[in-house]
Amino acid sequence: MLALASAGVLAGAVACSDNDDNNGPVPVADAGPDGGNGGLTDAGGEDSSTEPPGPNTIAGVVTQTVLVATANDPNVVNAWGLAFTPAGDAAWIADNGTGNISVYDANNTLVNTITVPVPDGIDTAAPSGLIANSLPDNFNGDAFIGVTEEGTVIGFPADGSDPAIRYDNSGSGAVYKGVAIATSGGQPLLLVTNFNAGTVDVFDANYAPTTITGGLTDTTLPAGFAPFNVATFGAAIVVTYAKQDDQKHDDVKGEGNGFINAFDLNGNMATRLASNGTLNSPWGLAVVPNDAAAIQGRLLVGNFGDGKINVFAAALTDSANMSATFEGVLGDSANNPLSIDGLWSLQFPPNAGTFDSKVLYFTAGPNSEQGGAYGSIAIISQP
């Protein structure tokens, strides 16, 4: 188990991809509905954070590009889930604030807007986690699977027909935030974080509720913390935890408000990867590709609470020997931590297609989730 130290700033020069079309990088003044940038910078700009680095700082350079924001796509409000087509030709963005999915190509051109269905009695969906279906022979053959804060699981058919509610748990008060696919004992499973109930709900290949052997539970977790996001890497099911508010609907931000666990593929607790420290409502999860030019193989954990990106040297391929060593946070040329207001997803595209698989893409809901952003960070130097 690792209790995180104060934030260091990790090396990793970051360049921003150029885009000249009308949906290209958004000027700072246009990135939020109130005219502010919500902590986001445009191409070539540096993050404006002035927070001093903590001890054991490692110098780094980080800039970022905002590719799409509320100013040039009003549907992109509190952009949350992010998933790429397996062919690597489109990015799907869950617009939590407007109940849509926005689909963009690699040139940042809007190619489709999809309305997320809602249960009876609810006007607009609040989509959160979103994934591409990596097991297309299962889960009704849906191309993408999303979840909502109303407690529904949504399937997006591969033939392009309208999405459908595959499971409706809204009656129980479920609040779904994250979603992942795992194979356990040869069986495909859908894993969904239920922030209200404090559980990871499990579904079989037909979207029917089921169980996983180990239960994906941690009896040592402090009261008031609940599963926030989930992802699978190697032999690990990684679950992040955030502090619940009184309604058990939203997280309570604050430095130290977070935990990360690794479970084996049978749902048994393997190890606590990280506790408290720099964690602040951790949600974004990604592993840097091994062919990337910098921090390859590292586990990246994005804080929704303060927008920082924590970097871990993690071992996740052997269920008996899982671990994570905190290395720092991504930072700018002045050793200030990069901070993306309202940071949600962190994703690398697949090797196939027109997106650069070495570029890190993100979504965010700046300005207290009233704005939205989809952008990129290209890591180009060694730490």
Which residue stretches match the model-derived regions?
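Bacterial N-terminal signal peptides that target proteins for export
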Residues: M1-A3
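Exposed boundary/loop context
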Residues: A5, V28-A31
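C-terminal motif of bacterial Sec signal peptides marking the signal peptidase cleavage site
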Residues: A11-A15
